[in-house]
């Protein structure tokens, strides 16, 4: 069985057009309602993954807290179009004559992620709930990791950097973060 469930309210990949993914994360009432349904039957931890494709990240976070989610994760990818082919005049990438938007990730989204983690870390309702925050979005180095932790994250997720540099990056990240924490006198 699974150790947990992540409700992905942030996916921009072809789901938002059908009222799923990031469309759910943009409507706090939907976020609370669906999370509540899952919490009624789940016997394992439920994490709500929030979309960055919203003006106020606090509203869906508070909705997830109200529905008693076990944790929050953020940010998912930023809805984007990466290019337009100037020869074919079509959105790129294009498969079978169809192009579309997708999710933008990696170091370029880090400032957005830091801002949103900070908003949740500083929100009185989210903070008072004690709900864990797991941060992602542009984490490539131990310095990136430290910034997210200082703004309110209790755990981190790294994907794009691992895809680019391999799993070795995690050991470097952990070593660098540990050394920095020791130099600052942080125990945890």
What positions do the PLM features span?
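Short beta-strand/loop segments at the ligand-binding rim of alpha/beta enzyme cores
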Residues: 40-51, 122-136
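C-terminal helical cap(s) of enzyme catalytic domains, especially alpha/beta-barrels
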Residues: 83-101, 149, 161-186
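Short, well-ordered coil/turn segments that N-cap beta-strands
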Residues: 2-5, 42-46, 68-70, 129-131, ...
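Glycine/Thr-rich beta-alpha phosphate-binding loop at enzyme active sites
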Residues: 12-29, 60, 67-129
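Glycine-rich phosphate-binding active-site loops on the catalytic face of alpha/beta enzymes
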Residues: 9-11, 67-82, 138-139, 144-172
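Conserved, mostly hydrophobic/aromatic
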Residues: 7, 49, 72, 120, ...
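Catalytic cores of alpha/beta
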Residues: 54-67, 118, 122-129, 139-156
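Generic structural signal for well-ordered alpha-helices
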Residues: 31-36, 58-62, 117-118, 145, ...
């Amino acid at each position: 069985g699974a150790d947990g469930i992540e409700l992905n309210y942030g996916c921009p990949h072809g789901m938002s057009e059908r009222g799923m993914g990031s469309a759910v994360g943009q409507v706090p009432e939907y976020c609370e309602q669906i999370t509540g349904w899952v919490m009624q039957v789940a016997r394992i931890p439920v994490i709500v993954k929030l979309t960055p494709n919203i003006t106020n990240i606090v509203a869906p976070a508070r909705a997830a807290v109200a529905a008693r989610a076990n944790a929050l994760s953020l940010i998912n990818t930023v809805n984007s179009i990466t290019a337009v082919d100037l020869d074919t005049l079509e959105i790129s990438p294009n498969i079978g004559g169809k192009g579309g938007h997708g999710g933008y990730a990696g170091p370029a989204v880090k400032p957005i992620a830091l801002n949103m983690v900070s908003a949740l870390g500083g929100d009185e309702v989210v903070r008072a709930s004690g709900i864990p925050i797991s941060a992602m979005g542009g984490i490539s180095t131990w310095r990136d990791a430290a910034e997210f932790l200082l703004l309110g994250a209790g755990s981190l997720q790294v994907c794009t950097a691992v895809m680019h540099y391999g799993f070795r990056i995690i050991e470097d990240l952990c070593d660098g973060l540990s050394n920095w924490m020791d130099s600052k006198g942080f125990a945890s």
